[in-house]
Curated annotation (Swiss-Prot):
The lineage of its organism: Bacteria, Pseudomonadati, Pseudomonadota, Alphaproteobacteria, Hyphomicrobiales. FMN binds at residues 10-15, 78-80, 113-119, 134. Transmembrane segments: none annotated. This is NAD(P)H dehydrogenase (quinone) 2. GO terms for cellular component: membrane. One of its GO terms (molecular function) is NADP binding. It comes from the Bacteria. Belongs to the WrbA family. Substrate binds at W98. It catalyses: a quinone + NADH + H(+) = a quinol + NAD(+); a quinone + NADPH + H(+) = a quinol + NADP(+). The keyword Metal-binding does not apply. It comes from Rhizobium meliloti (strain 1021) (Ensifer meliloti).
Length: 202
């Protein structure tokens, strides 16, 4: 059975919600799916004052376990057009896995959240994808078979590089059904691609 990890960092819950949809999409293929988050690096008292969502159900991941999965789909909110420092710190610790090629040939994908429509969605996706490519991973985005990203009738997330959502400057906008459908679709396609690669190797 194909093993998929949905690995995320979420300050306010938007990416946590998207991660659930990504996982549902991957599970729809019959894959074994695990959702985990990276450790919070902001001091708890500071995070609490900033109203971070600290009571998230997903367990905290370890770097060593990344090698146990056939696919890893990484999600985070943007920080000035790039991935959050929490996610960057976590991935930066994977040098040992990189050195021994432990992630070579595994499937990777990315999904993100920004405060505004033009707040760095694609550059944040690229910052994650670049990292995964250095690990030797095969990247799967969000193809236009997800028609929702073609809509101009409302604010929608989604790019060919990965699923996205727009949280609003004050965080009041939650992922829409179109955003969640994109996340589901990406999870499904990543899992199917990973299954095909595993079967080909066997």
């Amino acid at each position: 059975m194909t093993r998929v990890l949905v690995l995320y960092y979420s300050s306010y819950g938007h990416i946590e919600t998207m991660a659930g949809a990504v996982a549902e999409g991957a599970r729809s293929t019959g894959a074994e799916v695990t959702i985990k988050r990276v450790p919070e690096t902001v001091p708890i008292e500071v995070a609490d004052k900033a109203h971070f969502k600290l009571n998230q159900a997903a367990p905290v991941a370890t770097v060593a376990e990344l090698a146990d999965y056939d696919a890893i789909i990484v999600g985070t909110g943007t920080r000035f057009g790039r991935m959050s420092s929490q996610m960057a710190v976590f991935l930066d610790q994977a040098g040992g896995l990189w050195a021994r090629g432990a992630l070579n040939g595994k499937v990777g994908g990315a999904f993100v959240s920004t405060g505004t429509q033009h707040g760095g969605q694609e550059t944040t996706l690229f910052s994650i994808i670049t990292n995964l490519m250095h690990f030797g991973m095969v990247i799967v985005g969000l193809p236009y078979s997800h028609q929702g990203q073609m809509s101009v009738d409302e604010i929608v997330g989604g790019a060919p590089y990965g699923a996205t959502t727009v949280a609003g400057g004050d965080g009041s906008r939650q992922p829409s059904q179109i955003d969640l459908a994109g996340a589901f679709h990406q999870g499904e396609i990543v899992a199917r691609t990973a299954a095909a690669l595993v079967a080909a190797r066997n």
